[in-house]
Amino acid sequence: MYPCIHINLDKIAENVRVMKDLTEKHHIEITGVTKVFGGEERIAQTLVNQGIKRLGDSRIENIRNYENLPCEKWLIRMPSISEAREVVQFCDVSVNSELETLKALNQQAIQLKKKHKVILMVDLGDLREGYFKEEHLAEAINYAKQAKGLDLYGLGTNLTCFSFVQSDEEKMNRLLGLAKKYDASVCISGGNSATIHLMLENGIPEGINNLRLGESVLFGRERTNYEYLPGTSNDAFIMEAEIIESKEKPSMPIGKIGADSYGHVPVFIDRGIRKRAICALGRQDVDVETMWPVDEGVEIIGASSDHLIVGRIAACSRIIKVLSDHVSNCCKTGVFQQTIYNIGFYFAGV
């Protein structure tokens, strides 16, 4: 079945071991982010087998895929009030930045006779989620501490995701200072794979004890400079797609070029007549910009919603292999994206 993704669990396991060794030297525990692979249970199990005690996802439906695994389960996107009951049912921990949502979670936790842990998010300048004003954070902390159904687990922040503001020592110290000031320092989550560079430079202060890592544990890559970490593999996920047309055509389109379906005006270089192929795969399946060919002599020219155009500079078979730096649609933002059920998965190792 094509397209398909070959997933090497041994390489994922080794990447996890490398990252755990790095973070443990800095007294930091990992929450393994599973949205990259849609919460696929076998991959989640691989992370747990390597000693990852916490798994997190932005979607409850993904967390339910591995609800029976022996690990703490985090919802790492703020809950909707309408899903408060499900959050308490299936998640041990959730990140929060709205008082009304905390009240809804507390109500559901009391009804279900459970204690739900909450991490309050602090906006340190990326301007996505989190409390920006300290007085609002203090109000939420006071509520969480007295709420019968909630347990204030700690504080967290998120950087390099919206405005791409980078993590630095000053921001980490501010987060740590707030956690100490309000006695909310059981878990202080200092960010995602974009914080690894700061950790490697010994810039994370003692007391920041958690990072939420997906890209680095799966692909061995830190997010700030997009550099691969020594000892990791970047080919744990390989996608294969079938060629549905192979012809010689001009490399420069004929006629006036307009914007594509995504609002971008493509740029082409005239290289004369070239051998090229179309694969049965497109942007609704994969993030084309985060893939690159395995086969020598093949280049990715571009893609539309359902077609991937490659230059066949050298001879290759009818199957094109590409490395994927995310697997939601087999690639970057969710290794298994919108058409996850139209793509076959083949596992090797562990």
What are the residue ranges of the model-derived segments?
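Generic N-terminal amphipathic, Lys/Arg-enriched alpha-helix
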Residues: 1-7
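A broad, low-specificity signal for short, low-complexity segments enriched in glycine/proline
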Residues: 15-16, 34-37, 55-59, 79-84, ...
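Active-site anion/phosphate-binding pocket segments in diverse small-molecule metabolic enzymes
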Residues: 173-350
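A short, N-terminal amphipathic alpha-helix
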Residues: 15-24, 46, 62-65, 181
